[in-house]
Each structure stands twice: as structure tokens, then as C-alpha cells.
Curated annotation (Swiss-Prot):
[4Fe-4S] cluster binds at residues 231, 340, 351, 357. InterPro entries: DNA_primase_lsu_euk/arc, DNA_primase_lsu_PriL. GO terms for molecular function: 4 iron, 4 sulfur cluster binding; DNA-directed RNA polymerase activity; metal ion binding. Regulatory subunit of DNA primase, an RNA polymerase that catalyzes the synthesis of short RNA molecules used as primers for DNA polymerase during DNA replication. Stabilizes and modulates the activity of the small subunit, increasing the rate of DNA synthesis, and conferring RNA synthesis capability. The DNA polymerase activity may enable DNA primase to also catalyze primer extension after primer synthesis. May also play a role in DNA repair. It comes from Pyrococcus furiosus (strain ATCC 43587 / DSM 3638 / JCM 8422 / Vc1). Its cofactor is [4Fe-4S] cluster. Heterodimer of a small subunit (PriS) and a large subunit (PriL). Both participate in formation of the active center, but the ATP-binding site is exclusively located on the small subunit. Belongs to the eukaryotic-type primase large subunit family. This is DNA primase large subunit PriL. Binds 1 [4Fe-4S] cluster. GO terms for cellular component: primosome complex.
Amino acid sequence: MLDPFSEKAKELLKEFGSMNEFLQAIPSLVDIEEVMNRLKFAKESEISEDILNIEDIRDLASFYAQIGALAYSPYGLELELVKKANLRIYTERIRRRRKIRSDEIGIEVKIAVEFPENDIKTLEKVYGGLPEYIVSLREFLDLVPDEKLSSYYVYDGNVYLRKDDLLKVWSKAFERNVEKAVNIIYEIRDELPEFYRRLAGEIRSFAEKEFSDKFREVQAGELKHHLFPPCVKNALRGVPQGMRNYAITVLLTSFLSYARICPNPPRRNVKIRDCIKDMRVITEEILPIIIEAGNRCSPPLFEDQPNEIKNIWYHLGFGYTANPTLEDSGNSTWYFPPNCDKIKANAPQLCTPDKHCRYIRNPLTYYLRRLYLEEKRRAKHADEGSDKGGKERILQ
């Protein structure tokens, strides 16, 4: 198997019915030790031949076991480990394959068979031979927007690639597909067998040893408004009558509370008292933002419906009350942020997607992803600064 997101892989998965059914079957196909062995080699210089030559169905089971486990921590150390290990496996398999067919990898690729006669000599001179593959210009720019087109041969709406160039484009598609798969399974993680939760714990422990010195896990902390999804930013500006209760009580209340208190909840039925010891986190940091947004509505929500504040507490899991204590947590369900499909259905005006919304299924995972990317940039700049400082010390 060259790519778990290829058409060939999808055909194999059809034998199980749906992805959910395949996820239910995986614990009977592979065990946690086998899945972890696939990840632990990431620290080794060579990949085991047993891993490279595993049968297709076990390969898919091991890979999607990791994706299922990532649903419990979609953005963080674990994602870095899973992407790193699997990119090495599938990259090595692709390198070993003499010719790659379109149905074997997760991007639309064709074999380059025809070239303008006048360009053949130039191509052979620049590439040291004729390029082997073709990818549409549109897909190329989508996957590797920072690449300089002047470094490639472009003709008739296609980019001509050598195998190493194709691997560069494919790896970007693979990473994007991993995130897409995790976001899909995130929505059904409460239906998964206990196997995935245990595997998630094993992956977390190993990932902390592998990456903790370079990358901090996304944790509860001060809200970063500039990283909020568009739907939340729109709700914060205030909305007209007809959308107020959904935007403020349902969306903002759930999003702000989880984003501040428990951005990466281990399960859906968590209680606020499991996550904080001081109610001031809610009364001083979260509730004022909700009330301000309600006051920006037309007409102002809490002037028009003063008892709606009790409904806010109800959605936070404290029951229908105006003055709860921490001990009241659990008297009702702490509502999880609605997914993107529900927001589109109930308040379509809130949904104005930006470039970060692609493949995201829930506003909370949008926020997690933005935090994750910001942390990656911080770690990268820290490494670059460390390298620069080291060079300066050497020169001195």
C-alpha cells in the first residue's frame, strides 16, 4: 500500500461497509503493541522490512488505528509523531516503486508521455532526463503554494515532475489528508471502542519523549481571540433577532468555555468541575465576553430576555440557575460546541469560512489547529534563534 488515502485503499475499505465499521473492526485485526512498533521506529535510521512489506489490510488497520487514537487529541505532540512516522513509511514505499499509478496515491497524477518537440532538449538538459509525471497546475499550487513555478516545466495547465518532485507534492497532500481524517473521526470518537483511548495514551507517552523538548502540547489557558473561527468572531460582533439564542447561548457559550477551560477534552461528558477549581475562570473570563456579545445583538439579548442568563448556566452544565456554585457542575450537560454542519443549518449567516476552515468539522478543532500552528511557528523560530546564537558564539 503506497497511500492509505488512495483509490486503491478506498476500494479495500469498502469491504467493511463504512469507515465507522472499519474502525470497529480494527481491534480484531491489530493490537496496540503492533501499532506502537510502527511508530517507535521513527527514531531509528532504517525502517523495518516487516513494516514496509506488511499486507495491505493490516497496513490500513495499523494506520487508521492511529487516526482513531488522534481523535482524542487532534492537534499536538501525537499528530507530529503520527505524521512523521507514516510519511517515512509511505515515502520509502513510493521510492521503491518504479512507476506510480494514479489510483495508488492520494493525488491526481498522470504519467508524462508526450512533450513538445521543441522543449525536449531543454528538459533533458535541465532535468537530466525527461520528467516522469504530470500534476495539474491547480492542484500543484494548492498543495505547495510557496514553490517557485520557475523551477518547474509548466505546459498546457500541467506541471511536469520528477519522482522526487512528486514526493514533495504528495507529502503535502498526505499531511492534509491526515488532518481531514482526524477531523472526521473526531465527531464520532465517543462511539469508538476503548482500544483507541488506550492507544491514544500509549502514543501520548511516546510522543512526549520524542517531541516535548521542541513542542508544547495545546493546553487550557488565556483565550486568543485572533485565532477564533469566523463563526465565533461573527457571533461576538452581535447578531439580529432570530439568531441570538443560537449564536450566544449555544455557540459562544460552548465554544468559549471549552476553548478556555478544556480545549482538548478526553471525552464528551466531561464536567467543568473536572477541569477547574475556581469559578472566577467563568465569571471573570468567559461570562463577560458572552454578555458583551449578547448586548451587541439587535435587540440586546439579555435586556430582551433577562432569564437567558440562566440558560447560559444550563448550557455550561450547572442547571437552570442564576447563581451556581462549582458543586452544581453536572446538574445539566456541559454542551459541546455544535459542529460546522449544525451551524450552517441553524445560523448560516454565521458561517463565513476562511482558508483555515478547510477540512475542519467543528469550531473547537479550528481553534486547536490554529493554536497548534502558532506553537509550531514558535518552536521553529526558537530553534532558528538557537542555531543563530550558536553560530554567533562560534564566530566570537
